[in-house]
Amino acid sequence: MKIYLVGGAVRDSLLGLPVTEKDWVVVGATPEDLLAQGYQQVGKDFPVFLHPVSHDEYALARTERKSGKGYTGFVCHAAPDVTLEQDLLRRDLTINAIARTEQGDLIDPYHGRRDLENHVLRHVSDAFSEDPLRVLRVARFAARFAHLGFQIAEETMALMQKMAHEGELAYLTPERVWKETEKALGTSSPDVYFQVLRDCGALAVLFPEIDNLYGVPAPAKWHPEIDTGIHTMMTVAMAARLSPEIDVRFATLCHDLGKGLTPPELWPRHHGHGPAGVKLVEALCQRLRVPNPIRDLAKLVAEYHDLIHTVQVLQPKTLLKLFDAIDVWRKPQRLEQLALTSEADARGRAGFEDTPYPQGDYLREAFRVASQVSSAGVVADGFKGIDVRNELTRRRTQALADWKAQQPDASATS
């Protein structure tokens, strides 16, 4: 029985990146051998075991044969005679098909180390096309390693395009699509993930609402990049600079979906695109089973991001209505999330990347002023029932009016 460290742990250590989890392959053993040593079997479809002390995953060397559609249609063969090279051959990318012995020696039959050094994402074999999930995985790795200069090999991109064209992606479950997308949103370059999906034809299949934005023009005065799809990718890249939160990045991705509904004869203007986009956000999130908190923020951002751009000229009553609409009294974190998504929208434009966004600080300060007026103070003054809310609104409106009167003339700068 021989044990090898494989996959991401080897890859990341060679790249000088932190290793967060370790996966091992066991060659020349049976399930009974591992169970006798105290390992716990956890894989139903695959022979995967947990180490009795470290709880790392140990998998028996295996081969896989395509038996149906999608990423679950495989027959797995695990036996003591399966070699390490056979096990590595079934993996997606050469950079993930490197093994390390217990003595520290590298085993690299498919030249993954060379591709690491050349910053290339390349499939190991044509068996890559048997698993449609790998299209998303490659897009995610492209996003994760974009800052290191990694590019997808031409032959790998051609294979991904073929898979998208032949309809294999239709067999992916919503949960798997969202899981890969969520991981990609957490990388330093989430926009690259969606760009790769578009380049291979997968975006139109999995995210048609986003794909529809390409070719939709916006006024050149406000959007020098003109194309709404390009603007969306620029805003996602900006959101990644501004916030590590998946919620903020996903909401930014969805903020302009309504522009895809504008009739061409009305281009390049998109009046009312915010509220119009809410239904598209809802549909996308339901289809991919996006968690409710992420969905709810995305819907609010779609509806209110344009209003936040004009926050400096809003009347106190309108400001309070905005705070009520986003439920910021019970969920104060939403204020910062909306401020950041709106800033990403404003700065995610050609030539505006380093432009200040004073609306964000104005929104934060307005909320601070309004929240200093508490319902406890109103109750202490003897108000009861519905009168508490009415008086609270009146006092907050007055507080905002007094504060607003002390601000510089916003119309001159907005």
Curated annotation (Swiss-Prot):
Keywords: ATP-binding, Hydrolase, Magnesium, Metal-binding, Multifunctional enzyme, Nickel, Nucleotide-binding, Nucleotidyltransferase, RNA repair, RNA-binding, Transferase, tRNA processing. PROSITE patterns: HD (PS51831). Mg(2+) binds at residues 21, 23. It comes from the Bacteria. This is Multifunctional CCA protein. Residues 228-329 form the HD domain. Pfam families: HD (PF01966), PolyA_pol (PF01743), PolyA_pol_RNAbd (PF12627). Monomer. Can also form homodimers and oligomers. The lineage of its organism: Bacteria, Pseudomonadati, Pseudomonadota, Gammaproteobacteria, Enterobacterales. One of its GO terms (molecular function) is ATP binding. ATP binds at residues 8, 11, 91, 137, 140. PANTHER family: MULTIFUNCTIONAL CCA PROTEIN. Gene3D superfamilies: Beta Polymerase, domain 2, cca-adding enzyme, domain 2. It catalyses: a tRNA precursor + 2 CTP + ATP = a tRNA with a 3' CCA end + 3 diphosphate; a tRNA with a 3' CCA end + 2 CTP + ATP = a tRNA with a 3' CCACCA end + 3 diphosphate. Its EC number is 2.7.7.72, 3.1.3.-, 3.1.4.-. GO terms for biological process: RNA repair; tRNA 3'-terminal CCA addition. A single active site specifically recognizes both ATP and CTP and is responsible for their addition. Its cofactor is Mg(2+); Ni(2+). Disulfide bonds: none annotated. Belongs to the tRNA nucleotidyltransferase/poly(A) polymerase family. Bacterial CCA-adding enzyme type 1 subfamily. It comes from Pectobacterium carotovorum subsp. carotovorum (strain PC1). Comprises two domains: an N-terminal domain containing the nucleotidyltransferase activity and a C-terminal HD domain associated with both phosphodiesterase and phosphatase activities. InterPro entries: CCA_bact, HD/PDEase_dom, HD_domain, NT_sf, PolA_pol_head_dom, PolyA_RNA-bd, tRNA_CCA-adding_enzyme. Magnesium is required for nucleotidyltransferase activity. CTP binds at residues 8, 11, 91, 137, 140.
